[in-house]
From Swiss-Prot:
Residues 1-2 form a propeptide. The gene is rbcL. This is Ribulose bisphosphate carboxylase large chain. The record marks 334 as: Transition state stabilizer. Heterohexadecamer of 8 large chains and 8 small chains; disulfide-linked. The disulfide link is formed within the large subunit homodimers.
Length: 475
């Protein structure tokens, strides 16, 4: 060790443990445009002041550790440390606080969601001083956003590729999700696409199982796509799930999909991981493939109100990592999703600039500086009676995906697809004529039934089906 280093390390160093708030709680700090800002919902252990809890979060997710170390003297902690700069109590909750933390940009590797999450959502979530911790939102500064490619193509490029405008896109998840042979699976895909859907989909856990290996599925689905396109004159697609046990195998499947000439592949981005997802997104942009993203495992992370990571953060991370579609809940179907909160992160997926709006759970203004947008996918327990509400809630830039709501039609898959397409076209036409979908939705569907026996049959089957449970995801 050089004398100079010895002197710097020894001067002013005092071993021991000191409160985090002495270093990491800085209420006077003015945030910078280049800071990554985080809003944490913190539940301290009894006896732990909120200032100490917030400072502990800032410390443990940046430069801090449990004791003073002499190597602190070898760098500038003021430059690199996270700072808890504001704390506010959560209305209606005992001993819960929103703690705002600012992180200097130099803490993070460029273009790496993996590194960003490892820092901000790493060991701190197991910290003993906290009873619970939830990351509610992140502000990603433009300087960091510009280090990411983002979605392979984005909303406008996808519409141009498909030549479909002025309405939501329609999809269907093939059921049963497991157990079909590749040929029967391809048959179901063909029937749905021929009936009027834009897309069909592999379910999230369809990879390459003994009953249906991936290569066989890809071949039969490609045949179904081309046959349906020839008969309808419309561009069609099937989300071929490229998720695999290794990145190399995943890319191999995407390469085969490209060689078949199909328009879109799929990835389970949470179970597959952000590194794999970003790699696939880069491949898709370079090779003209759209990328559909499934969020399998998200509820393990985001459903508890006081611990975990809110889905709006996972949605922002996906936009940075890359994906052209992502499942976002339905508001009206069988899966969790409160309306205002869902629309908050739907806007974060689609729009270029989103203002802070605490009523929708948006803690920070977010500027995406032209990063392409992501289409939200409404999927899970929806059927034709939901079409007016879905069209009104999600608007044109969305994918409405009916699995059981297509394949459960009493006359078969193709009539189920016809029913959904007729219902959608009726709702879009009514909206364009100035009718109120929220108030007149059922009447609009009944009118369309008069000239579509397929829709009438679907309406009869699902007239009593509702999923009325209180949403867990509230402010």
């Amino acid at each position: 060790m050089s004398p100079q280093t010895e002197t710097k390390a020894s001067v002013g160093f005092k071993a021991g443990v000191k409160d985090y708030k002495l270093t990491y709680y800085t209420p006077e700090y003015e945030t910078k445009d280049t800071d990554i800002l985080a809003a944490f919902r913190v539940t301290p252990q009894p006896g732990v002041p909120p200032e100490e809890a917030g400072a502990a979060v800032a410390a443990e997710s940046s430069t801090g550790t449990w004791t003073t170390v002499w190597t602190d003297g070898l760098t500038s902690l003021d430059r690199y440390k996270g700072r808890c700069y504001h704390i506010e109590p959560v209305a209606g909750e005992e001993n819960q606080y929103i703690c705002y933390v600012a992180y200097p940009l130099d803490l993070f590797e460029e273009g790496s969601v993996t590194n960003m999450f490892t820092s901000i959502e790493g060991n701190v979530f197991g910290f003993k001083a906290l009873r619970a911790l939830r990351l509610e939102d992140l502000r990603i500064p433009p300087a960091y956003v510009k280090t990411f490619q983002g979605p392979p193509h984005g909303i406008q490029v996808e519409r141009d590729k498909l030549n479909k405008y002025g309405r939501p896109l329609l999809g269907c998840t093939i059921k049963p999700k497991l157990g079909l042979s590749a040929k029967n699976y391809g048959r179901a895909v063909y029937e749905c696409l021929r009936g009027g859907l834009d897309f069909t989909k592999d379910d999230e856990n369809v990879n390459s199982q003994p009953f249906m290996r991936w290569r066989d599925r890809f071949l039969f689905c490609a045949e179904a796509i081309y046959k349906a396109q020839a008969e309808t004159g419309e561009x069609k697609g099937h989300y071929l799930n490229a998720t695999a046990g290794t990145c190399e195998e995943m890319i191999k499947r995407a390469v085969f999909a490209r060689e078949l000439g199909v328009p879109i592949v799929m990835h389970d981005y949470l179970t597959g991981g952000f590194t794999a997802n970003t790699s696939l997104a880069h491949y898709c942009r370079d090779n003209g493939l759209l990328l559909h993203i499934h969020r399998a495992m998200h509820a393990v992370i985001d459903r508890q109100k006081n611990h975990g990571i809110h889905f709006r953060v996972l949605a922002k991370a996906l936009r940075m990592s890359g994906g052209d579609h992502i499942h976002s809940g339905t508001v009206v179907g069988k899966l969790e999703g409160e309306r205002d909160i869902t629309l908050g992160f739907v806007d974060l997926l689609r729009d270029d600039f989103i203002e802070k709006d605490r009523s929708r759970g948006i803690y920070f203004t977010q500027d995406w500086v032209s990063l392409p947008g992501v289409l939200p996918v409404a999927s899970g327990g929806i059927h034709v009676w939901h079409m007016p509400a879905l069209t009104e809630i999600f608007g044109d830039d969305s994918v409405l995906q009916f699995g059981g709501g297509t394949l459960g039609h009493p006359w078969g898959n193709a009539p189920g697809a016809v029913a959904n397409r007729v219902a959608l076209e009726a709702c879009v036409q009514a909206r364009n004529e100035g009718r109120d979908l929220a108030r007149e939705g059922n009447e609009i569907i009944r009118e369309a039934c008069k000239w579509s026996p397929e829709l009438a049959a679907a309406c009869e089957v699902w007239k009593e089906i509702k999923f009325e449970f209180q949403a867990m995801d509230t402010l």
